[in-house]
Amino acid sequence: MARTLFTSESVTEGHPDKVADQISDAILDAIMELDPYGRVAAETIVTTGLVLVAGEITTNCYVDIPRLVRSTIEDIGYTRAKYGFDAETCAVLTSLDEQSGDIALGVDRAFEAKKGEMDDKELDAIGAGDQGMMFGYASNETAVLMPMPIYLASKMAERLGEVRKEGIIPYLRPDGKTQVTVEYEDYKPLRVTTVVVSAQHHPEVSSATIEKDIIEHVIKAVIPPEMIDAHTIFYVNPTGRFVIGGPQGDSGLTGRKIIVDTYGGMARHGGGAFSGKDPTKVDRSASYMLRYVAKNIVAAGLAERCEIQVAYAIGVANPLSINVNTFGTGKISDDKIIELIKKNFDLRPAAIIRDLDLRRPIYRKTAAYGHFGREDAEFTWERTDKADTLREQAGL
């Protein structure tokens, strides 16, 4: 088989787009904690000295959004005015309305039965919050069943944050990006060919020091040694300088890192972002559910790779279509896998929210370093508790 290269990138929590994502999800979490049935669609823009939060929020609780914005920025690490963006001094503007009544018509019905178990009729009565198509994916090339390029890129971005906050590399600042190229043969990862790390830093630190520290404490701390060889190329701050960064260097906007958030381009994406959206928005909840489904299919050994697409209509509970692609790696047919999905997974929006327990303040931590492939108990869509059942029903 011919060998191929595939590349994915990730960014740190201090990247301007990720600052915006985290603010949006911090607002969502604050509302979910006080009002689990609140409706939230919070969009954030950040730029030099300014944060603007806009969108639609319907809730019976009060959230101090400016205070929440500042505490989120402080947690990320923008705490000095000379960074061009500072938790204490930045301006915070808000422009928020209630959710459109026309949209609510398709979602609200039967939410008066929100306490206790909903019967099948009530589950059918709660429709999707919008039309659209969503994808889920899993691959057996890593232990967490994620594509290797995005998994390693996300882990390196997370490691950049760790070495900064723990003082291991004390001169780093919050912004940063990572990129990993993996060589494949017959869809099996062979080696890492190239690693790129760009890390914001104090102006008086030499390029040689930065390169040495990043290779030692970030790249080699994350990339498995067996995936690196004498021909692997490391690029550390290839422009030679990365002092101006974060919202001072570029404006940031919620929802602009959807490939970083998911599978690094290895799987398709329906186009809908996640952050700032409550779980009635199927852009988010259905994507989480499809990751859960795909991961269980791969964990069960039904396929080595699996991509699933579903589509919804606003106000309609059941998906309009389900498509499965195992890329020729399936142990049973894709049609048979679709039958197993319909038998074992309820893809109606209210059932997704129920089965993944999505009405909780769990979203801020998803907003940096990827929504998938994370080993955290609160990421319920990463469970593989259906794998044994799927394997048995498939006759494997």
UniProtKB/Swiss-Prot annotation:
Q: Does the keyword Flavoprotein apply?
A: no
Please list the GO terms describing molecular function.
ATP binding; magnesium ion binding; methionine adenosyltransferase activity
What's its job? Answer: Catalyzes the formation of S-adenosylmethionine (AdoMet) from methionine and ATP. The overall synthetic reaction is composed of two sequential steps, AdoMet formation and the subsequent tripolyphosphate hydrolysis which occurs prior to release of AdoMet from the enzyme.
Q: Which residues bind ATP per the record?
A: H15, D175, G176, K177, R241, F242, D250, R256, K257, A273, K277
EC number(s) from the headed UniProt entry: 2.5.1.6
| UniProt pathway | Amino-acid biosynthesis; S-adenosyl-L-methionine biosynthesis; S-adenosyl-L-methionine from L-methionine: step 1/1
The reply on keyword tRNA-binding is no
Compartment list: Cytoplasm
Query: One GO biological process from the UniProt record?
Result: S-adenosylmethionine biosynthetic process
Q: What is this protein called?
A: S-adenosylmethionine synthase
- Enzyme type, top EC level: transferase
Q: Which residues bind L-methionine?
A: E56, Q99, D250, K281
State the GO CC annotations: cytoplasm
* Cofactor stoichiometry and binding remark: Binds 2 divalent ions per subunit.
Cofactor field: Mg(2+); K(+)
> Which HAMAP family does the record match to this protein?
S_AdoMet_synth1
The Swiss-Prot or TrEMBL record describes its family as follows:
Belongs to the AdoMet synthase family.
Q: How does it assemble?
A: Homotetramer; dimer of dimers.
Under the heading NCBIfam families, the entry gives: metK (TIGR01034)
- Gene name as annotated: metK
Binding residues for Mg(2+): D17
**Principal location listed in the UniProt entry:** cytoplasm
InterPro entries hit by this protein: ADOMET_SYNTHASE_CS (IPR022631), S-AdoMet_synt_C (IPR022630), S-AdoMet_synt_central (IPR022629), S-AdoMet_synt_N (IPR022628), S-AdoMet_synthetase (IPR002133), S-AdoMet_synthetase_sfam (IPR022636)
Residues that hold K(+) according to the record? E43
